[in-house]
Amino acid sequence: MTSTSTKPTVILVHGAWADGSSWQKVIPLLLKEGVPVIAVQNPTSSLADDAAATRRIMNSVEGPIVLVGHSWGGAVITEAGTDPKVKALVYVAAFAPNAGETVGDQVGRYPAPPGLSQIKNDGAGYLTLSEEGWINDVGQDLPKEEARVLAVLQPPLAASTFGDKVTEPAWVSRRTWYIVSTQDRVVSVDLERELAAAMGAKTTELAASHLSLLSMPEAVTSVILDAVAALETA
């Protein structure tokens, strides 16, 4: 898919245990506003693999890009976002490692949120989240039936991803926005606030679960549109 619009293209990068459909409620709202948008489908097998898959999509786009990352996707846009076409980064309850830092390093800085206790290891190097975790911790503000579907759809995450180091963090040299989920039970809320402050991001706090993009899509879209508008008026 190639975009030739002069309007910035929004590229959506999903998190762990998810795919591009996690943006299903945000995408129609962006399209309604005439914003070109592409949702990446990442393998969640390593930071390098996910960054490469994201770059392939970026290479298909002409003109400025707004990269949006949810959760683990924040590490991906941090790694892939140094491309000159990337003009803005939007982090949604997301990790944002510094140079030489891993997601595991960031997780370890604060007491573990309750959702992390619901991670299951298959013994072969891959992790999933229990159905209970999806219902009570990941998407506790979603209908139970919706959370159960997400549990069924989740792809396994390579456990080694938590040890993958960022090389050059894009947030150091790009305009940034950060959405904090104040009811997050998967990523530490204190960590989210710390990361937003460290990058000097324009910060929005939502009284939402880790899945604000599904429970509060209008509010998430509003922040993305703010980033798009900032580039259009720059």
Model-predicted regions and their roles:
Residues A48-I65:
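Conserved acidic catalytic loop of the alpha/beta-hydrolase fold
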Residues T182-A208, L214, A219, D226-A227:
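Conserved loop-alpha-helix segment in the C-terminal half of the alpha/beta-hydrolase fold
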Residues V149-A170:
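Active-site nucleophile elbow and catalytic-triad environment of alpha/beta-hydrolase enzymes
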